[in-house]
Every structure is written in C-alpha cells, then in structure tokens.
C-alpha cells in the first residue's frame, strides 16, 4: 500500500498538466475575452460571462450596428452573468438577447443601468438589484418572459417606459417608498401581475402603465 501511494504521488508531481484533481482546481477555461471601455470581460467554457474593473460600462447599440457588446457574437453560449465589485453602471444594450442566461450577479457598486440592458433575457426568472441602484433605463427588461418577481430598491423614483413590458410570467412587484412615477407601458402585457402595491408617494401613473389601464 505504501509503495502504491508513493508512486501515485510521484505521478502527480511529474505529470500535473491535465490532472486538476491533484491540486483541487476545477475552474473552467476562458474561451473568449478582452476589454470594453476601462473594464475587462471573460467568457468561460461553462457559460459564465464576467465583467471586472472600476467604473461604468460603455453604452452599446443593438445587433444591427458595429457598436454591439464585444460578447454579443457569443450570446448563445452565455448562461450566467457576474458583474464584479467596482463596476458602477450597466450600459445600454449590454446583455441584450442573452436568451439562455438564468443567473445574474450585480454588485453593490452598480447604481444605474441603461436602456434595453437585459432585453429578451427570456430564461431569467429572478434578478436581485443592489441597494444602491437608483436608476434603470427604458425597456431594460423588455420581453423577459420567465421573470416572476421583482423587488425594486429604495432610492428609485421612476419606473421608466416599458421597463418590464411583455414579462408575461411576472406576478409580483415590490415597489419602494421612494417611487414617484410609473411611466407608460412600464408593465404593459404583464397579464399575470396580480400582486403589486402602489406606494403613497406615487403621484404619476401614465397611460398604459399596467395591463388594462388606459
């Protein structure tokens, strides 16, 4: 038995490459990556897109232009998004059409997100906003068809136009006391939305903000 253990140890020491079990490492390999503005991004073989660095993400454009996010050609590979502490803003169109994403991690350093940021992330069932977030853009979660519940953080004063439109399975929205305005189409075609309480501080509810409200 001792001789067997001795030769096994020697084998691990002599041939470490490819034997991740010897050092306990099982991290997935990076298959794509680069920079975007002042930030760095990587996509690993197991589908995790990670954004790291300090400062805001750039604003991007939709899929018909040359200014799409650098990971856009690989959206069908992405199943999870992790934004690192230090990133302060999610750019316009940042994660559009990431249809297979089921998990999103947003750090406390993020205070805002742009328009169409999570457009058509149709596999995402829930998302947790950081407490410091005070603004998200128009159409930010448009067509997130699997999204079931949303808790909007204290500090947000406006739910923008069509922010959650066509989230067909959204049933519950928790709104903060800081909320003042719900813009037109904010929850348009969210026909399963049955659990929502409008805070006393809301003074403006625009036409079409909720299904059946005209």
Residue ranges and their predicted role:
Residues 48-55, 75-89, 99-112, 122-135, ...:
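Structural signature of tandem-repeat unit edges
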Residues 4, 16-17, 158:
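Compositionally biased, low-complexity segments
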Residues 18-28:
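Sec-dependent signal peptide cleavage junction
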Residues 1-8:
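Bacterial N-terminal signal peptides that target proteins for export
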Residues 1, 15, 34, 64-65, ...:
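Intrinsically disordered, low-complexity regions enriched in Ser/Pro/Gly/Gln/His and often acidic
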Residues 91-94, 114-119, 137-140, 160-163, ...:
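Consensus positions within tandem repeat domains that build extended binding/scaffold surfaces
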């Amino acid at each position: 038995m001792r001789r067997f253990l001795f030769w096994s140890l020697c084998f691990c020491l002599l041939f470490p490459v490819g034997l991740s079990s010897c050092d306990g490492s099982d991290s997935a390999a990076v298959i794509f990556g680069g920079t975007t503005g002042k930030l760095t991004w990587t996509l690993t073989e197991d589908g995790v897109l990670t954004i790291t660095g300090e400062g805001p993400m750039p604003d991007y454009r939709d899929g018909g232009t040359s200014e799409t996010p650098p990971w856009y050609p690989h959206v069908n590979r992405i199943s999870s998004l992790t934004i690192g502490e230090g990133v302060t803003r999610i750019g316009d169109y940042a994660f559009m059409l990431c249809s297979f994403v089921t998990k999103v991690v947003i750090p406390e350093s993020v205070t805002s997100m742009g328009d169409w940021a999570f457009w058509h992330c149709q596999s995402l069932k829930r998302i947790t906003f950081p407490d410091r977030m005070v603004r998200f853009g128009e159409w930010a979660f448009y067509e997130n068809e699997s999204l079931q519940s949303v808790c909007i953080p204290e500090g947000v004063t406006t739910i923008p136009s069509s922010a959650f439109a066509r989230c067909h399975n959204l049933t519950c929205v928790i709104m903060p006391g800081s909320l003042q305005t719900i813009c037109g189409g904010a929850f348009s075609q969210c026909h399963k939305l049955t659990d929502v309480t409008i805070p006393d501080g809301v003074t403006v509810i625009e036409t079409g903000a909720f299904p059946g409200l005209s």
